Amino acid sequence: MNCPVRRVITLKLKPFSINAMFCRDKRHKTIEAQEWSCSILVALALKENKKKLKELRQYFDPKKHVYKVDLTFFYPKHVLHKKEGGISARAHDLSNVEKPLIDLIFLPMFYDRPSPYGAKNLNIDDKYITDLRSRKRVGKDFRIRVTLNIKDLPSN
């Protein structure tokens, strides 16, 4: 069946690696991670994104639906590629940039917090993501495109 609801959110921000998320004690976020998280949450609270997230929340039924998430991380060419060819070490590992972003978009712990520490996100456990695709692309600037699809829960 075709996707009942699909929304695209573009965040004009750099990807952030989970490797840089926590201090050495592994319990406290670094200042950079806190600032990045706040920037994402502020972007999610923008009128156009707030509307899209609300539409997804209103439609989604955890007994009937799952999420398919598509993430595209855009990097300037000089960051993604090395001068001599190949992929630069400055282009993060995809699996390391997925989780921090997914948590901010999905998790209920951010839903009722005041800005910039929270946003009216999807307010649901990310366990409902059953299909996740991510990729790195060259772009004019850093940005992240998040495509959120609500799919019918498979019956098998």
Question: What is each of the regions a protein language model found here?
Answer:
Residues 1-156:
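Acidic, proline/glycine-enriched N-terminal capping motif
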